[in-house]
């Protein structure tokens, strides 16, 4: 279905006696056009983004072997479960909920619509700031491989990364238009993951003695472990599942479930490999950006870093797409996306959004802290608290007493985790802000 066809119309869904009318809300972007496999690649691109190069340092170092391995496995299972709850509600009430806020508003009312949009916007904004920091850090890593004059600092590279992201955003009108870029993204992911694994194994074999002890005082350990728990859920969740599900063809629930099963089985294996092997090789000294820890030929490290830069640009576009869709729909962008009028609009709107994101990224370039805070204030509420309560609310009459209790236990537990992780993340940012000035060259 093209953008111009998606105008609050109804379509028939189902076979035989099960045919129902499903209302399609207004949107300027293309929906219902992608196969489940393409959607699976969108999800896998997110889970194996350049963020995976940070998990050895931001998850395994604070949690250690037992906590890290068990935590990742549990986070995988509960994230799959929470995402399936959201996916099953996509056509709840005879309407396709192509935005997270639409679903929340339909179930709870107008206030929940605005609250969910606010949470989601913060979630995606911080994720995108993280991608710009990642791309800038990778760009700096390439620079210092060949020049060690320190003339250019991290904020300069973050600015360059932001410019690249803006150019890409202007050229790709909507999520479905990524097309071949998803294949490019997968190829780029394989490059930096394989390089990181091979060089880590080589370093690990050469350096048999490593320290895996969790560092710091009892109080600092408590805060870093809590922050790492937020990183665990951040690793697996997009916070924009309905927006991604909107692009999949009918039957949307069945096809989305296929995509989710792919993401949480085959899709997580590269992430597991680079996370565990990186920590095995360097122990508690693992950098929050793994390619800064590895040793090897300059050209190989440069190739991996360039791949991380380009993949971050593609990933950012995925996570920024709900914001772009909102702007395009609100201001009535119609017709050929490459018409001069539409190009100028994207230059102003998307360029402005990325400019603000780039400024914040350069101002506070603490990647691990961004991941912890994002997981705490938005991933926990959106993916776990809201998903369980929405499902409970929507399916209340069909749930038995034990199922209702189960969903309420999830709501309470993840609410407590969200508060604790937010406190830990704010403390981490406060500590780093004391140790480093704004626009720091990390």
From Swiss-Prot:
Gene Ontology MF terms in the entry: L-proline transmembrane transporter activity
* Pfam families to which the protein is assigned, alphabetical: Aa_trans
- Reply yes or no: does the keyword Membrane apply: yes
* Disruption-associated phenotype: No visible phenotype under normal growth conditions.
Q: How does it sit in the membrane?
A: Multi-pass membrane protein
Question: Where, by residue number, does the polypeptide cross the bilayer?
Answer: 35-55, 58-78, 124-144, 157-177, 178-198, 222-242, 260-280, 302-322, 351-371, 372-392, 411-431
User: Chief localization class?
Assistant: membrane
Gene Ontology cellular component annotations, sorted alphabetically: plasma membrane
Tissue/organ expression = Expressed in vascular tissues of roots, leaves, stems, sepals, petals, stamen and siliques. Expressed in pollen.
Q: Which domain of life is it from?
A: Eukaryota
Q: Which UniProt keywords apply?
A: Amino-acid transport, Cell membrane, Membrane, Transmembrane, Transmembrane helix, Transport
Give the subcellular location.
Answer: Cell membrane
Gene Ontology biological-process entries: proline transport
Family per record: Belongs to the amino acid/polyamine transporter 2 family. Amino acid/auxin permease (AAAP) (TC 2.A.18.3) subfamily.
- Give the misc comment: Treatment with toxic concentrations of proline reduces shoot growth and root elongation in wild-type plants, while plant lines over-expressing PROT1 stop growing shortly after unfolding of cotyledons.
Q: What does this protein do?
A: Proline transporter that mediates proline and glycine betaine transport. May be involved in long-distance transport of proline and required for phloem loading, retrieval of proline leaking from the phloem, or in xylem-to-phloem transfer. When expressed in a heterologous system (yeast), imports D- and L-proline, glycine betaine and GABA across the plasma membrane. Has the same affinity for D- and L-proline.
Know the name of this protein?
A: Proline transporter 1
């Amino acid at each position: 279905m093209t953008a111009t066809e998606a105008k609050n119309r109804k379509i028939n869904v189902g076979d035989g006696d099960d045919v129902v009318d499903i209302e399609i809300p207004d949107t300027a972007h293309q929906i219902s056009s992608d196969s489940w496999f393409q959607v699976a690649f969108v999800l896998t691109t997110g889970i194996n983004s350049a963020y995976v190069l940070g998990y050895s340092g931001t998850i395994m170092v604070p949690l250690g072997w037992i906590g890290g391995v068990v935590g990742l496995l549990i986070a995988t299972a509960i994230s799959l479960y929470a995402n399936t709850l959201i996916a099953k509600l996509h056509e709840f009430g005879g309407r396709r909920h192509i935005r997270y806020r639409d679903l929340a508003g339909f179930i709870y009312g107008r206030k929940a619509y605005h609250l969910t949009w606010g949470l989601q916007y913060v979630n995606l904004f911080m994720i995108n700031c993280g991608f710009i920091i990642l791309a800038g850090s990778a760009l700096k890593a390439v620079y210092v491989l060949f020049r060690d004059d320190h003339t250019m600092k991290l904020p300069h590279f973050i600015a360059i990364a932001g410019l690249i992201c803006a150019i890409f955003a202007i050229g790709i009108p909507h999520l479905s238009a990524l097309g071949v870029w998803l294949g490019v993204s997968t190829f780029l992911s394989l490059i930096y993951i394989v390089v990181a694994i091979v060089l880590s194994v080589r370093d690990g074999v050469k350096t048999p003695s490593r320290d895996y002890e969790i560092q710091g005082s009892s109080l600092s350990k408590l805060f870093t472990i809590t922050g790492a728990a937020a990183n665990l859920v951040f690793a697996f969740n997009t916070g924009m599942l309905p927006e991604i599900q909107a692009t999949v063809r009918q039957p949307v629930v069945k096809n989305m479930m296929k995509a989710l099963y792919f993401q949480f089985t085959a899709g997580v294996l590269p992430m597991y490999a680079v996370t565990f092997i990186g920590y095995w090789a360097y122990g508690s000294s693992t950098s929050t950006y793994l390619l800064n820890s590895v040793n090897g030929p300059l050209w190989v490290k440069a190739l991996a870093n360039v791949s991380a830069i380009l993949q971050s640009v593609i990933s950012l576009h995925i996570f920024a797409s709900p914001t772009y869709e909102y702007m395009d729909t609100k201001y009535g962008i119609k017709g050929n996306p490459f018409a001069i009028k539409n190009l100028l609009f994207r230059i102003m709107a998307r360029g402005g959004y990325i400019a603000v994101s780039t400024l914040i990224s350069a101002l506070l370039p603490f990647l691990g802290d961004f991941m912890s805070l994002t997981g705490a204030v938005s991933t926990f509420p959106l993916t776990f608290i809201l998903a369980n309560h929405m499902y409970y609310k929507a399916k209340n009459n069909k749930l038995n007493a034990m199922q209702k209790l189960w969903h309420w236990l999830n709501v309470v537990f993840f609410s407590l985790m969200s508060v604790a992780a937010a406190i830990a993340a704010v403390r981490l940012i406060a500590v780093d802000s004391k140790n480093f000035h704004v626009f720091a060259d990390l």
